[in-house]
């Protein structure tokens, strides 16, 4: 914000389990909030399923344990249904830089923002070479049905292809 004299909001998508903890952790940093925007929104939740038959689990002692967050792939749906997307657009924001919380080196980049503004590109992904520490998260793959490049997560990777998912090259 200081370097570019720009009002860049920092917004967290949390699960129903982490939202209040995140708010409490950010409370001491009063200068993080941008006028008209919350510091976060809550992603959706979905039922936990049994691995053997994919039916919902039942936890009568605590029905809250029957639910789980769908993960970072829920970003687009949660942005829309939470009203956050409408608020951002109404305040004049046109671009978003999205980073997962485990990407601690992520930061807004003026050159990338300029590239979007100049080209009109609807989307771009920042990718890097995997290291020995990169054993989870997504990886790039070529979809067999149409030969398109996709980002594939663990749940989408067949057991016989997990070697590719966890390789370093």
Question: Where on the chain are the PLM-derived regions?
Answer:
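Domain-scale recognition of functional cores that engage charged ligands
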Residues: 1-169
């Amino acid at each position: 914000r200081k370097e570019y004299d720009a009002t860049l909001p920092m917004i967290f998508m949390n699960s129903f389990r982490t939202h209040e903890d995140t708010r409490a952790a950010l409370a001491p940093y009063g200068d993080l909030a941008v006028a008209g925007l919350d510091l976060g929104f809550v992603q959706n939740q979905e039922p936990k399923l049994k691995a053997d038959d994919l039916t919902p689990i039942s936890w009568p002692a605590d029905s809250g344990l029957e639910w789980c967050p769908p993960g970072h792939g829920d970003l687009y749906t949660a942005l829309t249904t939470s009203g956050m997307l409408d608020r951002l657009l109404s305040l004049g924001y046109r671009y978003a830089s999205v980073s997962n919380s485990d990407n601690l080196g992520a930061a807004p980049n003026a050159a990338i923002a300029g590239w979007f503004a100049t080209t009109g590109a609807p989307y771009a992904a920042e990718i890097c070479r995997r290291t020995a520490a990169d054993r989870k998260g997504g990886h790039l793959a070529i979809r067999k049905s149409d030969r398109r490049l996709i980002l594939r997560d663990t749940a989408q990777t067949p057991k016989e292809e997990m070697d590719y998912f966890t390789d370093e090259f």
